Amino acid sequence: MAAMTVQLDIVSAESSIFSGLVAHLQVSGAEGDLGVMPGHAPLLTHIKPGMARIVKQDGKEEVFYLSGGILEVQPFSVSVLADVVLRAEEIDEQAAVEAKRRAEAHMANAGADFNYAAAAIELAQAIAQLRVVETIKKNIAR
């Protein structure tokens, strides 16, 4: 018996990052983590900066970092549209650590003209990238 799958397309502002059949997708939605499997109800929602984990048709997993964006679920296809999409192995861990440190410093030393929203977004994106790196390291250690 063939595994049930759904067509998934992950697209960044620059290019198509992934297109193929998947058995499962997990993303960080605006209201919490979302799991999408074949037969999922139609849905359109914002996604937060975080990890997208897919289980492909052959059972292999792949992990991506998404900067946030839109998730659209239709009966036979799922689309993820994000400004920035990185495969887990493309994440520069040191750059993410530095971005996190920088955002925390800006928030701690905020002046009158401080843009809190921009610093919060930078911090959330850096933390999300570091979580993806940690997840990959845990999977490799198994």
Swiss-Prot record:
Pfam families for this protein: ATP-synt_DE (PF00401), ATP-synt_DE_N (PF02823)
Domain of life: Bacteria
Ranges in coiled-coil conformation: none
Classification via SUPFAM superfamilies: Epsilon subunit of F1F0-ATP synthase C-terminal domain (SSF46604), Epsilon subunit of F1F0-ATP synthase N-terminal domain (SSF51344)
Span of the signal peptide: none
Keywords: ATP synthesis, Cell inner membrane, Cell membrane, CF(1), Hydrogen ion transport, Ion transport, Membrane, Transport
Membrane topology: Peripheral membrane protein
Compartments reported by the entry: Cell inner membrane
Gene Ontology cellular component terms for the protein in this record: plasma membrane; proton-transporting ATP synthase complex
UniProt-recorded Gene Ontology molecular function terms: ATP binding; proton-transporting ATP synthase activity, rotational mechanism
Record family assignment: Belongs to the ATPase epsilon chain family.
Protein purpose: Produces ATP from ADP in the presence of a proton gradient across the membrane.
Subunit structure: F-type ATPases have 2 components, CF(1) - the catalytic core - and CF(0) - the membrane proton channel. CF(1) has five subunits: alpha(3), beta(3), gamma(1), delta(1), epsilon(1). CF(0) has three main subunits: a, b and c.
Protein name per Swiss-Prot or TrEMBL: ATP synthase epsilon chain
Species of origin: Shewanella loihica (strain ATCC BAA-1088 / PV-4)
